[in-house]
UniProtKB/Swiss-Prot annotation:
<comment type="similarity">
    <text>Belongs to the cytochrome c oxidase VIII family.</text>
</comment>
<keyword id="KW-0812">Transmembrane</keyword>
<dbReference type="GO" id="GO:0006123">
    <property type="term" value="P:mitochondrial electron transport, cytochrome c to oxygen"/>
</dbReference>
<keyword id="KW-0999">Mitochondrion inner membrane</keyword>
<protein>
    <recommendedName>
        <fullName>Cytochrome c oxidase subunit 8B, mitochondrial</fullName>
    </recommendedName>
</protein>
<comment type="pathway">
    <text>Energy metabolism; oxidative phosphorylation.</text>
</comment>
<keyword id="KW-0496">Mitochondrion</keyword>
<keyword id="KW-0809">Transit peptide</keyword>
<feature type="topological domain" description="Mitochondrial intermembrane">
    <location>
        <begin position="60"/>
        <end position="70"/>
    </location>
</feature>
<dbReference type="Pfam" id="PF02285">
    <property type="entry name" value="COX8"/>
</dbReference>
<keyword id="KW-1133">Transmembrane helix</keyword>
<feature type="transmembrane region" description="Helical">
    <location>
        <begin position="36"/>
        <end position="59"/>
    </location>
</feature>
<comment type="function">
    <text>Component of the cytochrome c oxidase, the last enzyme in the mitochondrial electron transport chain which drives oxidative phosphorylation. The respiratory chain contains 3 multisubunit complexes succinate dehydrogenase (complex II, CII), ubiquinol-cytochrome c oxidoreductase (cytochrome b-c1 complex, complex III, CIII) and cytochrome c oxidase (complex IV, CIV), that cooperate to transfer electrons derived from NADH and succinate to molecular oxygen, creating an electrochemical gradient over the inner membrane that drives transmembrane transport and the ATP synthase.</text>
</comment>
<dbReference type="InterPro" id="IPR003205">
    <property type="entry name" value="Cyt_c_oxidase_su8"/>
</dbReference>
<feature type="transit peptide" description="Mitochondrion">
    <location>
        <begin position="1"/>
        <end position="24"/>
    </location>
</feature>
<dbReference type="GO" id="GO:0045277">
    <property type="term" value="C:respiratory chain complex IV"/>
</dbReference>
<dbReference type="InterPro" id="IPR036548">
    <property type="entry name" value="Cyt_c_oxidase_su8_sf"/>
</dbReference>
Length: 70
């Protein structure tokens, strides 16, 4: 057990160097509230940006398989 304090001293300097920046969180409401239409458009664009490329790849999967074996 006498070796434990020197080992702990080796771990202390890296822990002191890690400084976590303070977040700028505001409790105030938004200056311009987002309308439900804007929220719907934004949400649908987010879903489309992920689903359209995945659908493209899945629909052309057979052609990708054929071109890679040739």
């Amino acid at each position: 057990m006498p070796r434990l304090p020197p080992a702990l001293r080796l771990l202390q300097p890296p822990l002191r160097c890690w400084v976590v920046p303070k977040l700028h969180v505001s409790a105030k409401p938004a200056r311009t509230p987002t309308s439900p239409a804007e929220q719907a458009v934004g949400l649908s664009m987010m879903f489309l940006s992920f689903l359209v490329p995945a659908g493209w790849v899945l629909s052309h999967l057979e052609s990708y398989k054929k071109s890679s074996t040739a």
